[in-house]
Amino acid sequence: MLATVLLLLLLLVATFTDVRWHKIYNWTTYPGMLAAVAINACGTLILAYGDAQRWQPVLGWIPDVPNPLAASILGWLACGFVMLLCLVTFQIGGGDVKLIAMLGAFLGLEQGLVTMLWMLVLGGALGLVLLIWQVGIGRLLVKVGRHLKNVLKLGRHAPLPEEDRAYLQQPLYLAPTSIPAVLIVRLGVLDWLF
C-alpha cells in the first residue's frame, strides 16, 4: 500500500510538471527510485526474517517474487533500458526515461513493462484525441483520404506536406497517462470493469 500510494503521489507531481513546464524533474524521479529500492529491500529482509503476511499489505513491495529487491532492480534496468532506446530512436525526453525507470523500480519487470505499454497506448489515444480536437474530425478525414489517394497513385510512400506534418509534432505526454496505467496494472481496474 505504501509503495502504491507513494508511486501515485510521485506520478501526480510528474504529471503536473510535465503538463505545466514540459519537464519531469530529477527531484521527482531520483528519490522515487531510491524509495522503491528501499521498500523492496525491506520486503526482501522481511521475507527472509520477518512476518511477511503482516507487512506486505502495509509496505506493498513487489508481490509473488522470492527477492523483491532483485525484482526492483531488474524492473528499473529493463524499463530504463527500453526507454533509453526510445530516447535514442524517437523524440522521448530524458524525464520520461527516468519516470518509466522509476515505475520499473516500484513495479518490477513484468508489471513495469505492462504499465509502460499501457502508457504508450493511452498516450497515443490522448494524442489522437488532441489531434481531432485541433484539426476537426471532418478535416482530418479529408486530409487522411487525400494522403491515401496520393500514396495509391504513386504506388509508394508519399511524404506529408509540411503543414500536415506540423500537426503530428505534438509532444507525447507520458506522465499524465502513467496514473491510469498504474491503476490498470497495480490495482486491476480493468478487472473490476469486466
PLM regions: where:
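A membrane-topology feature that recognizes alpha-helical transmembrane segments
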Residues: 1-92, 97-194
